[in-house]
Amino acid sequence: MTQLIITYQSDSKLEESEVFLSELNRIKKEEDKFAKFSSLSDLRAIVKKGEFRIVSIYLSSGSILAEIFTFEFLKEFYGVLDFGSVLKVNILALDSIDKVKAFERNLLFSGFIKVKKLKGDGLNSSDSDFEIVIKAEKPSWKPEEGKVLVDDIDLEGSVPDIKNYVPLGQGKESCKSKERACNNCNCGRADLEKEIGIEAARKVYQEKVETGTARSSCGNCYLGDAFRCSGCPYKGMPAFKPGEKVSLANAEGDANDRTVDMNLIHEEKVDLITTTFDDDGSGVSNVQSKGGVLKLNI
């Protein structure tokens, strides 16, 4: 495995070091190449001359490291290296641990992976006599290899059919066995409890579920949306004549025929009927008081 060994041209302290010379003699093989660089363009030209799996850089101090290998420098240097290359930075003397930590962060931000500090804080051991050895790798894959094309995904098959959706909650049938309305009630029972009391509302909902009967509290259902209540089961349907047969669709998509009978009964002392409607159009009635009213049956 061919190795490229490089040093900084102006790093005079390194060249005077006997530790570096002995290290160079120890690791250098015949197929390895030794070179010096003074700028990024020099380093780019040196790396492009051959296919090097390992690039070892030797520096005398952390100050030299911070001066040369800035984030912008590392980004450019990252693009020069072959995929799968290993970068080893050897520092002779540790004069600033903060600069070394900043260099490690810049390696990660530049795209390198598996950044390790092999010496200097007792984390790992190394055969090198240098005080700090930092190792990093350039990924062996290209960024495009991890990209998934949208065309490869079967969007239609990944989205379940809306007909098979199960609605949240148990539905109005669960109200029959409950003592009182749910905390997040949206079927109207909570409002009915406030008006007529908990026990009376429970009985009304029992009758409502068992019989499915409903009565109008306004008598305006047949006139159209402009005259209908917000919870009217005929909301969205055109106006119709009293007594006309109207077909409503329930939650499952089936159709239930309901006869709308808006016949008026003469005014007399009768019970006042309060009615609450569900989203599916069913309604319940409760006797509240005595008064002169018109009874309207739906």
Swiss-Prot record:
For the region Fe-S binding site A, give the residue spans. 175-187
What biological process terms from GO does the record include? iron-sulfur cluster assembly
Tell me which UniProt keywords the record has, alphabetically. Answer: 2Fe-2S, 4Fe-4S, Cytoplasm, Iron, Iron-sulfur, Metal-binding, Mitochondrion
Region annotation N-terminal SAM-like domain: residue ranges?
A: 1-143
Sequence motif Cx2C motif 2, residues: 229-232
HAMAP family membership:
Anamorsin
> What's the entry's take on its domains?
The C-terminal domain binds 2 Fe-S clusters but is otherwise mostly in an intrinsically disordered conformation. The N-terminal domain has structural similarity with S-adenosyl-L-methionine-dependent methyltransferases, but does not bind S-adenosyl-L-methionine. It is required for correct assembly of the 2 Fe-S clusters.
Q: What is this protein called?
A: Anamorsin homolog
